[in-house]
Amino acid sequence: MSKPIVLSGVQPSGELSIGNYLGALRQWQQMQDDYDCQYCVVDLHAITVRQDPKALHEATLDALAICLAVGVDPKKSTLFVQSHVPEHAQLGWLLNCYTQMGELSRMTQFKDKSARHSNDVNVGLFDYPVLMAADILLYGAHQVPVGSDQKQHLELARDIATRFNNIYSPEAPIFTVPEPYIPQVNARVMSLQDATKKMSKSDDNRKNVITLLEEPKSILKKINKAQTDAEMPPRIAHDWENKAGISNLMGLYSAATGKTFEEIEAQYQGVEMYGPFKKDVGEAIVTMLEPIQEEYKRIREDRAYMDAVMKAGAEKASERAAVTLKKAYEAVGFVTRP
């Protein structure tokens, strides 16, 4: 029996955070035995916001090495760089012609990003969701792990797939209509200084973010200065409405140690100050990230291995993507190249 196909991607823009790890990359590793996984470093998406070429080059290799370091196995999963598989851009153009301007103008992420990058509101940023649809539909993905910020884009991909199928092949659909896969994670990873906002690797205030490759001393310092509250006596309780800062730290501690919120509350019942709890949270994060950082350094220094992974992944991805692209091209009437 064939496994359900899953596709997910990670952007090589900025340093990956523990939010990226707990919200996505850790699930990538865990899903490999039960799903046919397609994982990509989405460098085509990254350039919808202006990038320094050298920084993008290094960030792409960094992201690939991190994927490998967290446990993505190229023998179990297809791991590749998006721009190495030209079918993504090719199908993206075709799908543009089956997407309405009004649909794209309603995308909230475009509104948010265009407001933040008002000096460079380019067509690629507007068109981002169509390329994402191509990413998904090329591989016949049954499920796509998405956070709340990407659910609208997945809905658009479903609409495009359904529209194309209804026009050209209602009896034998060319595209699989994907469903969302909502990962069950312990931690809602929020900003360290403002726990009402999601932790973002692109946050200009670096005190809000812990990166996967961050030095232990820096991690401990940031957690020590993280938002808590002024309740007296101090109380460790998981209550997002009234104790967002503490709840955020509890989520991180739970994710790093495997302890439940109930166990954490019992462990720190009757504390006289938040300092010891913060110290334990910081040390738990350092312990969680240490093996990942060590493996990352080993892999990042082995460029021959990384090249081999990229080459094999691109070839495997292209082989599958080419089949879908050929069907779509034939459906619209393109002449097959002799």
Swiss-Prot record:
<dbReference type="InterPro" id="IPR024109">
    <property type="entry name" value="Trp-tRNA-ligase_bac-type"/>
</dbReference>
<dbReference type="GO" id="GO:0005829">
    <property type="term" value="C:cytosol"/>
</dbReference>
<keyword id="KW-0648">Protein biosynthesis</keyword>
<keyword id="KW-0436">Ligase</keyword>
<dbReference type="Pfam" id="PF00579">
    <property type="entry name" value="tRNA-synt_1b"/>
</dbReference>
<feature type="binding site">
    <location>
        <begin position="147"/>
        <end position="149"/>
    </location>
    <ligand>
        <name>ATP</name>
    </ligand>
</feature>
<feature type="binding site">
    <location>
        <begin position="19"/>
        <end position="20"/>
    </location>
    <ligand>
        <name>ATP</name>
    </ligand>
</feature>
<keyword id="KW-0067">ATP-binding</keyword>
<keyword id="KW-0963">Cytoplasm</keyword>
<feature type="binding site">
    <location>
        <position position="135"/>
    </location>
    <ligand>
        <name>L-tryptophan</name>
    </ligand>
</feature>
<protein>
    <recommendedName>
        <fullName>Tryptophan--tRNA ligase</fullName>
        <ecNumber>6.1.1.2</ecNumber>
    </recommendedName>
</protein>
<dbReference type="InterPro" id="IPR050203">
    <property type="entry name" value="Trp-tRNA_synthetase"/>
</dbReference>
<feature type="short sequence motif" description="'KMSKS' region">
    <location>
        <begin position="198"/>
        <end position="202"/>
    </location>
</feature>
<feature type="binding site">
    <location>
        <begin position="198"/>
        <end position="202"/>
    </location>
    <ligand>
        <name>ATP</name>
    </ligand>
</feature>
<dbReference type="InterPro" id="IPR002305">
    <property type="entry name" value="aa-tRNA-synth_Ic"/>
</dbReference>
<comment type="similarity">
    <text>Belongs to the class-I aminoacyl-tRNA synthetase family.</text>
</comment>
<comment type="function">
    <text>Catalyzes the attachment of tryptophan to tRNA(Trp).</text>
</comment>
<dbReference type="InterPro" id="IPR002306">
    <property type="entry name" value="Trp-tRNA-ligase"/>
</dbReference>
<feature type="binding site">
    <location>
        <begin position="11"/>
        <end position="13"/>
    </location>
    <ligand>
        <name>ATP</name>
    </ligand>
</feature>
<keyword id="KW-0547">Nucleotide-binding</keyword>
<feature type="short sequence motif" description="'HIGH' region">
    <location>
        <begin position="12"/>
        <end position="20"/>
    </location>
</feature>
<comment type="subunit">
    <text>Homodimer.</text>
</comment>
<keyword id="KW-0030">Aminoacyl-tRNA synthetase</keyword>
<dbReference type="InterPro" id="IPR014729">
    <property type="entry name" value="Rossmann-like_a/b/a_fold"/>
</dbReference>
<feature type="binding site">
    <location>
        <position position="189"/>
    </location>
    <ligand>
        <name>ATP</name>
    </ligand>
</feature>
<dbReference type="GO" id="GO:0006436">
    <property type="term" value="P:tryptophanyl-tRNA aminoacylation"/>
</dbReference>
<dbReference type="GO" id="GO:0005524">
    <property type="term" value="F:ATP binding"/>
</dbReference>
<dbReference type="GO" id="GO:0004830">
    <property type="term" value="F:tryptophan-tRNA ligase activity"/>
</dbReference>
